[in-house]
Amino acid sequence: MITIKKGLDLPIAGKPAQVIHSGNAVNQVAILGEEYVGMRPSMKVREGDVVKKGQVLFEDKKNPGVIFTAPASGTITAINRGEKRVLQSVVINVEGDEKITFAKYSTEQLNTLSSEQVKQNLIESGLWTALRTRPFSKVPSIESEASSIFVNAMDTNPLAADPSVVLKEYSQDFTNGLTVLSRLFPSKPLHLCKAGDSNIPTADLENLQIHDFTGVHPAGLVGTHIHFIDPVGIQKTVWHINYQDVIAVGKLFTTGELYSERVISLAGPQVKEPRLVRTTIGANLSQLTQNELSAGKNRVISGSVLCGQIAKDSHDYLGRYALQVSVIAEGNEKEFFGWIMPQANKYSVTRTVLGHFSKKLFNFTTSENGGERAMVPIGSYERVMPLDILPTLLLRDLIVGDTDGAQELGCLELDEEDLALCSFVCPGKYEYGSILRQVLDKIEKEG
């Protein structure tokens, strides 16, 4: 068992009851193009087209053969683009239940599948996009191979769902999914990472290795798992996938149908009844959160409060990789002499406010509690960084765009979510996730 001692479990109010409920019905879903790093779409549909569930919507020009399929049947009502015609979202009004079927197998056949059979079914169904690489966090090329595959069956993000609750209901599908993934590279390790105290289904597979992690966030991030088990570099790549996509893989191969359901956490200080709800990948979040939120101006986030995406306008949908929807209040109010008050209702990791010594949960808002200023190395980053890297030096190199120095200090192991806690504790109010992405893009472009 690997214990993570450095990090932070954010004391935020609105933790979800770990019981699965039906969510609000939604009649609109979307695929968010900007979730897929470096993707350039070649559209196969246009506005007004009627599509079936599992039908191809677009293909990645920069990654030939990787296709993106409809999570539901219906009519394409909008193809939203941003600056430089970047694809923001493809919106579907859900109608009917027509679907495309794919190859299916009995449970007994799964352990005899060839790598090519597994790959072909994943690609044709669009489930290949559930896999991501590290470094760079991109959908892998269909011709590439990984040193190993990581399955993340734990989640320590603030307000997250407990994976064991979800997996208890879909145990056979999860086991089937593990079996299928083990056949993708039979000679390479399949790492299943779970919480030390969790009881989740597994499978008796030759290349399956089970790892227990415990401790504070980011103990549940796949970047943490990769760092301690099979570190990556410029010449070494691993792939990873989350536990709900493993369930979808299991269902695809045994039913021949694309499975788009998600069980997510709907939680946060502004949610009336925080709980786990069933919904669909790409669900319209305005519809999903209707009558669920407290009065006032709220910010709905697809993902964690630490590193999720703001859900509004053409991005008002549940992300492909998001397993939670978090809602906090917009914090635009000015506080008279706020900096000089004891501030018993505010939290700080630096013990500068009275609230630090309280054991209560806090109603966090979007307020940054200060303006941007120079990066100040006072030990905050080291407090929340459990990986064997020098965070202050790495973050400095990221800020100035020193790609060589950043690589030497381990930036290739990281994704935006791995630096979310550094952004949270930063006295200078830097957003290190977006800075990291710029550096990673530059490294990949320049080789």
Swiss-Prot record:
It catalyses: a ubiquinone + n Na(+)(in) + NADH + H(+) = a ubiquinol + n Na(+)(out) + NAD(+). GO terms for biological process: sodium ion transport. The keyword Translocase applies. Pfam families: NQRA_2nd, NQRA_N, NQRA_SLBB. Keywords: Ion transport, NAD, Sodium, Sodium transport, Translocase, Transport, Ubiquinone. It is an enzyme of class 7 (translocase). Its EC number is 7.2.1.1. InterPro entries: NqrA (IPR008703), NQRA_2nd (IPR056148), NqrA_C_domain (IPR022615), NQRA_N (IPR056147). GO terms for molecular function: oxidoreductase activity, acting on NAD(P)H, quinone or similar compound as acceptor. Composed of six subunits; NqrA, NqrB, NqrC, NqrD, NqrE and NqrF. NQR complex catalyzes the reduction of ubiquinone-1 to ubiquinol by two successive reactions, coupled with the transport of Na(+) ions from the cytoplasm to the periplasm. NqrA to NqrE are probably involved in the second step, the conversion of ubisemiquinone to ubiquinol. Belongs to the NqrA family. This is Na(+)-translocating NADH-quinone reductase subunit A.
